[in-house]
Amino acid sequence: MTHEEAHETVRGWFTGRLPEEWFTGPVEITIDREEIAVIGPLATPETGEGVSDAERSAAVDGRIKAFREDTRDRRIAIAREAEHRFGHKVAWGVDCEGRRALFTHLSVPVMTRLRQPERRVLDTLVEAGVARSRSEALAWAVRLVTAQRRLAA
């Protein structure tokens, strides 16, 4: 089975297994060597016209929190089935009104070889107080690049 076929199998299984009422559209499935991330779109809360950004933001926070709490037991059961079937841990997340929230996901150590100029960049981030260690500085840099790519998209 090719990588693409495996991805399609996982996506199809989750599409068939997830309750239809959970999400307003198709889920986004991301797979790497350790984890399957399932991110679904939630309905935007009805706030009425003329509400402040703070009220709208609080409504989105409430919608995300309610989904997380209300679906916890079923998500755990589905994740266990998927972990047994596909051999990967499952992480859950939602997207609501452009805000993405991941509930639980793996933090996996990644080994890399860096030359001195690259290590100096990490050391500068540590010295500036951006990170406590080279590892944390590297994670910070990856998050920064990811955020910039989202803005550019």
What is each PLM-predicted segment?
Residues 116-136:
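Surface-exposed, Lys/Arg-rich phosphate-binding patches that contact polyanionic backbones
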Residues 48-65:
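A solvent-exposed, charged loop/short amphipathic helix patch at secondary-structure junctions
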Residues 91-113:
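Short Lys/Arg-rich basic patches
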Residues 134-152:
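Short, basic amphipathic alpha-helical segments that act as recognition/interaction helices
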Residues 71-98:
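A short amphipathic beta-strand at an alpha->beta junction
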Residues 1-27:
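N-proximal, solvent-exposed amphipathic alpha-helical segments enriched in charged/polar residues
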